[in-house]
Every structure is written in structure tokens, then in C-alpha cells.
């Protein structure tokens, strides 16, 4: 609710909508995803952010659970799959991403943009962290698959998940 919007700086401490909050509201999407799109302009990562936002707007892509919890695999599938069974969902995600990219181009660009010249996995983590800052997670020592979120809650990944041995995670969805 309001506390979340204040944490994301979309509302002021007094509950007034901020300039960023007004920009985000113009996208007509979940505030976290809208914030990710706005933040993406600062790093020139708009197309990537739109793809991520479109992916996160869907429950999951066909076969998504098979690849574990890493959104990087879903993003690759979005970009490369040509299987007929995936066509409807992935086409909808691609269309949504393109629509948001068009909306972003129509918005005044960020004044101080610094291109993000790191591997795509780090760019994805940065974008997700900008939308879900309280869900940054550090691995718990000696407990593979066990993480402590920035907000203080614990989170677990199955040992079979490739991310279970990661030192840190930028989390976009908790089940």
C-alpha cells in the first residue's frame, strides 16, 4: 500500500505523489514495474527493462518452471523461442514490451544518463533491485539455498535451482 509507495519514493512521507510517482502512474502498470522503466532510462537499459516488465507481468512463460527461478533463462526464451506452443504467450509478452518501449520513447529522457556497460545479468539485477529494493538477498553462510532478504525475512530456493548457490540475489517474485 502506501508504505510500499513511500519506500519506492513514489509518494512523499506526507503521502503526496512525487514527480517520479506521476511518471510511473502514466504507464498504467504495477508501480514497481513502472519505476523499473523510469530507472532504466538512467542507464540506457530501456528495451531490457521493458522485456523484464512484460515477463514479470505474466504468471510465467511456457516451460518456465523447468529452468528454475532465474529470469535470465526466461528472457533468453522470450528472445529465441519459435516453438508454436509458446507462440501465444511469448507474442503477447513481446507486444507488451514493444508498447512500453514506445511509451518510454515518448517520455522526456533522463537528464544524466550513464550507459550501463556490464554483463546483461548484472543489468538485470540492477533493474530488478531498483523495483524491489527490499527483496535484495544475501546467502546465509553454510546453508545453500537459504537467503536473508534486506527486509529481514528469509527465503529459500530448492537445491536443484541453479541460483541456490548464489552469493546474492535480486528477487522480483516471492512464492
What are these regions (language model features)?
Residues 1-175:
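Second RecA-like catalytic domain
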Amino acid at each position: 500500500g502506501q508504505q510500499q509507495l513511500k519506500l519506492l519514493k513514489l509518494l512523499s512521507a506526507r503521502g503526496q505523489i512525487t514527480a517520479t510517482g506521476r511518471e510511473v502512474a502514466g504507464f498504467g502498470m504495477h508501480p514497481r514495474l513502472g519505476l523499473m522503466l523510469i530507472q532504466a532510462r538512467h542507464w540506457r537499459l530501456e528495451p531490457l527493462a521493458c522485456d523484464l516488465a512484460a515477463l514479470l507481468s505474466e504468471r510465467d512463460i511456457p516451460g518456465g518452471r523447468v529452468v528454475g527461478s532465474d529470469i535470465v533463462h526466461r528472457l533468453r526464451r522470450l528472445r529465441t523461442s519459435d516453438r508454436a506452443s509458446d507462440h501465444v504467450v511469448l507474442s503477447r509478452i513481446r507486444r507488451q514490451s514493444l508498447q512500453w518501449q514506445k511509451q518510454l520513447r515518448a517520455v522526456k529522457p533522463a537528464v544524466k544518463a550513464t550507459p550501463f556497460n556490464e554483463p546483461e545479468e548484472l543489468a538485470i539485477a540492477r533493474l530488478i533491485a531498483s523495483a524491489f529494493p527490499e527483496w535484495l538477498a544475501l546467502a546465509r553462510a553454510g546453508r545453500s539455498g537459504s537467503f536473508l532478504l534486506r527486509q529481514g525475512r528469509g527465503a529459500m530456493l530448492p537445491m536443484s535451482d541453479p541460483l541456490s548457490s548464489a552469493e546474492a540475489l535480486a528477487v522480483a517474485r516471492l512464492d
